[in-house]
Amino acid sequence: RRVHREAVVLARDADAAGLAEMKFGAGKGQPGTVIMITLGTGIGTAIFHGGKLLPNTEFGHLDMNGKDAEHRASDAVRQLEDLSWKKYAKRLNRYLFAMEKLFWPDLFIVGGGISKQSDKYIPLLGIETPVVTAQFLNEAGIVGAALAARKEK
């Protein structure tokens, strides 16, 4: 859109984070299907196939035992319920397993605020698809938003 002759770019936070990680970070050069998962107050997702974003996915709303996944496996829930890393990893593993069976991805990239502590839960995951930490951690969305805006100019 244009406002006062300037372009305005809208991007979901997880999509923006995924753009950054695919261009400069953990997903750079990765073939196949890559899923960016942002874990914070909710769960955000960005899905890339062949390096192209499939925009506006909302798989934080995937059902997990009668609740949205983000009400079971987000970082906010981990903190609210004071879950141990082992219990949190078990919940996150269930979510990633469901995503794995839906998409058969080649890579999961985990970002968001909790990514700074990924060494405490990623080693506890037991899915087939590799899971790596976002290179830009919680700043990936900022970098990706700048990329999206730059692309529009």
Which ranges hold each PLM region?
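General beta-strand structural signal in soluble alpha/beta enzymes
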Residues: 8-13
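ATP-binding/phosphotransfer module of carbohydrate and carboxylate kinases, centering on a glycine-rich
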Residues: 2-6, 20-39, 47-153
